[in-house]
Amino acid sequence: MRRRFLAFVCCFGMLASLLPCSVKANGRTTNVNLLETPEEVAEVFYRQNASLRKSKGVTAQDQQNEIRKRVIVESAQTLENTYGAVKTYYYTVGGYQILLYDSADQAELAVTNLKKDYPGVHIFQDIPVTLEEAARDGDADVQVEIQDAAEKEDESETETEIQAFDGIHMMGMDKLKEDAKDWSGDATVAVIDSGIDEDHPWFTTRLDRKNSVNLAADGLGKDAYNDPNQGHGTHVAGIVTQATPVQVKIMAVRVFDLTGSASYTTITLGVDYAVQHNADVINMSLGFEILPGFESDDTDLMDEAFARALEAGTTVCVASGNE
């Protein structure tokens, strides 16, 4: 028993030496807080946006400026100098630190200095991403199609599905659904996107309301995953429900806010959340574009989230485009 106790103490001591405890930055002392779930990280981003929520007429540019105030350091090593970070966090699932700054310019300067201090460590400003204008414009017509199809469902369900989404028929998904009519299993598909229209009749019995969530910075909670503006997530989830048997449920993971903005970090949180809540499949038909000014290796964070998902046995489906 004594040996086990000593071994535990030694292991704990080694872990504590790796995790950051505090940093001193330009006269500031910043305690490092541990964040153990994607929801906890989302809450930090939500609090960061507090002043923005009080403003009227918040734009996508405003949201993107807030995102650029964050710096990601992919290391558990204690930082001797954060160059002015007002808050420092360590996300245990992803194994990286999140530094918050008063301005995007301060964050950019900090990245330059931190890269000099820690060569070989992946350090970058959080990356704003936006839903493509083409996707947003096209979804207005898609929503009309969905609504028309739902109203005609009583006439002929199979015919309606094909009329609403020709792609389902082209890919043979309508036949697959018919072949699976006697399937006795179940599955949950996490749709990481702009949310979902929770009141749409197609989702009445197909939505996993317990685990659907909003991780976007404009709201929190299980009841905030509704998609009132964009429609893209509703479109994607509609295709899933109409191409699969009733045993397949949708877990709506909202990562885009009302302006159509998200961050690379928030999207990776969506992947972690889906894995932690036992999604069988993750769907990311996001149709977003990375704004200019970022290096290609900044996307490693997403690759690492995918690796965690695959290790957990979760299937990840990512769209490459609509062509």
Residue spans for each PLM region:
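Positively charged n-region of N-terminal signal peptides that target proteins for export
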Residues: M1-A7
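Hydrophobic core
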Residues: C10-L18
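Autoinhibitory propeptides
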Residues: M14, Q61-Q63, Q77-G167, E178-D179
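Sec-dependent signal peptide cleavage junction
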Residues: L18-T29
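Solvent-exposed loop/turn segments at secondary-structure junctions
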Residues: D105, I127-L131, S194-E198, V246, ...
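Structural detector of well-ordered beta-strand residues that form the stable sheet scaffold
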Residues: F124, M251, T315-C317
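Substrate-binding/access-modulating region of protease and related hydrolase catalytic domains
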Residues: F256-E323
